[in-house]
Regions:
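Low-complexity, acidic Ser/Thr/Pro/Gly-rich terminal tails and inter-domain linkers that flank the onset
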Residues: 36-65, 179-202
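A surface/secretory-pathway sequence property marking extracellular, secreted
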Residues: 85-124, 131, 138
Length: 203
């Protein structure tokens, strides 16, 4: 007569713990899904018209030379852009040397990026909202570290969350490329006596 209560009491906690564990797992799963949705909850959805109005970067550079990359964008639409962004590919290359911990190697060292523009993405910068008709410039200080013919690809965006999309006037993506020749020898330079500015020969 004593055996039945013992079996009953030992089985009951097992069922209860299993139910609790399953419920906890389900709750965690639901909570995790909700957290992901909230990351870009404040970013509006839609297309925002953007024009790349100016790009400045020396097409010929010497190894070790420091140059300024300037990309200016304009909001050519009627609505404020939530967060104007710029993605630049080609600042690094992937090394094929075996056994290296990090295969990415710099083609240009970034001495300074756009002020207050750092994001969680290594090749994307953001400069905040941009009102209709306004312009904003992304400016980098870059030093060439690898010789050869190099290509930079740049693309404007309207937000980091993926809901706001930048489009050109023709409906395409506001983007472009720059082809730069980096020589092994530093560029010769002179000082313009009229302006006092340093001028690189060959530009």
């Amino acid at each position: 007569m004593l055996a039945s209560p013992l079996v009953s009491s030992s089985a009951s906690p097992k069922i209860t713990l299993g139910c609790v564990a399953a419920a906890a797992l389900l709750a965690a799963s639901i909570s995790g899904c909700g957290g992901g949705e909230q990351q870009d909850a404040n970013e509006p959805s839609g297309n925002y018209e953007v024009a790349i109005s100016k790009v400045s970067f020396p097409r010929r550079q010497g190894l070790g030379e420091t140059s300024k990359l300037v990309i200016t964008v304009q909001n050519t639409g009627q609505s404020e852009i939530p967060d104007i962004t710029m993605t630049v590919n080609g600042l690094n290359y992937r090394s094929t040397e075996p056994g290296v911990a990090d295969p990415l190697r710099p083609v240009w060292v970034i001495n300074a990026g756009p002020i207050n523009g750092t994001t969680a993405y290594v090749n994307t910068w953001a400069l905040g909202p941009l009102a209709a008709g306004d312009e904003r410039s992304f400016i980098w200080s870059l030093s060439a570290t690898q010789p050869g013919t190099r290509t930079l690809e740049y693309r404007a965006g309207a937000g980091l969350g993926g809901k706001a999309r930048a489009v050109a006037a023709d409906g395409g993506i506001p983007a472009g490329t720059l082809v730069v020749n980096v020589t092994r020898r530093p560029q010769d330079s002179t000082v313009d006596p009229a302006t006092g500015q340093v001028v690189q020969k060959g530009e």
